Curated annotation (Swiss-Prot):
Organism: Chromohalobacter salexigens (strain ATCC BAA-138 / DSM 3043 / CIP 106854 / NCIMB 13768 / 1H11)
Superkingdom of the organism of origin: Bacteria
PANTHER family: METHIONINE SULFOXIDE REDUCTASE, METHIONINE-R-SULFOXIDE REDUCTASE B1
Gene Ontology MF terms in the entry: peptide-methionine (R)-S-oxide reductase activity; zinc ion binding
Designated name of the protein: Peptide methionine sulfoxide reductase MsrB
Family: Belongs to the MsrB Met sulfoxide reductase family.
Record keyword Metal-binding present: yes
Reaction catalyzed: L-methionyl-[protein] + [thioredoxin]-disulfide + H2O = L-methionyl-(R)-S-oxide-[protein] + [thioredoxin]-dithiol
A single Gene Ontology CC term: cytoplasm
Protein encoded by which gene: msrB
Composition bias type Basic and acidic residues, residue spans: 1-12
ATP-binding keyword on record: no
Taxonomic path: Bacteria, Pseudomonadati, Pseudomonadota, Gammaproteobacteria, Oceanospirillales
HAMAP family, A to Z: MsrB
Sequence ranges assigned to domain MsrB in this UniProt record: 9-132
Record-listed E.C. numbers: 1.8.4.12
Amino acid sequence: MSEKVQKSEHEWQQQLTPEQYRVTREKGTERPFTGDYQVSDEQGIYHCVCCGAPLFENEHKFDAGCGWPSFDRPLADASIEEHLDTSHGMRRIEVTCRRCDSHLGHVFPDGPQDTTGLRYCINSVSLDFHPGE
């Protein structure tokens, strides 16, 4: 993975849409069933919308019925970081981009048991899909 991407909040605001900024830089969550990538079967790679790092592959995407794109694993363990998140009175594991620290979503232990058993529940707005990769 490349070296860390560091920008000022102003630079992020200039680069991202207001919704992308709210979710990725302020740890927000998009409304369920509203994201562009919630339903997509096209093969390709999902990159971080902030820094372009490759994060997830459509081959490992599945329909969890939760309203957000769900994957059973990242493209590479080195592409993400996981952090304990105790916000909103809950105890969850937050998933961030290792390269730029953008908030992507959360990982839960209720994914497909025939693969990893994990569900990476990711905000569509935090991703940029590159078909055919």
